[in-house]
């Protein structure tokens, strides 16, 4: 018996269905990460992945290995947990985007931390992350993020409008 599942080959050929976004979830505990990945799987519209370690290098490696299109990172504002604060999670986002420029990154945090709103807004303004959610994450919000991700995947896969497929424009 193999412990590792074979990866499904990407959809290709005429009539192949558009590939679903690969959505990675990295929460503050492995149990919450598993629960989030299961929830994403039940929601549909993506291929979920749970990243059980929230160490920056581990997250970057796994996102790169799995070619994640979307990354959900949970924040933790407990005392003494700086690596899970806005700046620590933005560090992960920057490193993931260095390897996967098209990967969309969203931060999730619980209610009750209005003092963090300015930092979250600044992270979006600086394009370190694509967005955030404060409070309970709704299925509608995730579907919106998945739709945005699928749209950006489609845009990235299509040739520029002034270029014919299979041909390169001269610079």
PLM region spans:
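Structural beta-sheet core signal
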Residues: 25, 106-107
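Non-catalytic signal-transmission and effector/linker regions of two-component phosphorelay proteins
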Residues: 1-39, 138-171
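Acidic, metal-coordinating helix/loop segments flanking the phosphotransfer/catalytic sites
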Residues: 52-70, 80
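Two-component/phosphorelay signaling modules centered on CheY-like receiver
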Residues: 30-55
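Output/docking surface of receiver
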Residues: 48-54, 108-161
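A short helix->loop->beta-strand "cap" motif at the edges of active sites that frequently abuts
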Residues: 100-104
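Conserved phosphotransfer microenvironments
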Residues: 70-99, 109-119
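N-terminal cationic-hydrophobic initiation segments that often serve targeting/anchoring roles
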Residues: 41, 63, 97-98, 124
């Amino acid at each position: 018996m193999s412990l590792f599942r074979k990866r499904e080959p990407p959809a290709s050929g005429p009539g192949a269905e558009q590939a679903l976004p690969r959505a990675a979830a990295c929460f503050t505990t492995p149990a919450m990460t598993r629960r989030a990945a299961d929830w994403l799987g039940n929601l549909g519209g993506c291929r979920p992945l749970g990243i059980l370690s929230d160490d920056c290098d581990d997250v970057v490696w796994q996102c790169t290995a799995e070619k994640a299109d979307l990354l959900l990172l949970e924040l933790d504002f407990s005392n003494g947990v700086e690596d899970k604060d806005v700046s620590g999670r933005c560090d992960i986002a920057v490193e993931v985007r260095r390897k996967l420029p098209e990967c969309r990154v969203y931060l999730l945090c619980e209610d009750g931390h209005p003092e963090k709103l300015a930092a979250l807004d600044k992270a979006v303004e600086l394009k370190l992350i694509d967005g955030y959610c404060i409070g309970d994450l709704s299925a509608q919000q995730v579907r919106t993020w998945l739709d945005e991700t699928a749209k950006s995947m489609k845009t990235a896969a299509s040739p520029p409008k002034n270029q014919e497929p299979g041909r390169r424009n001269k610079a």
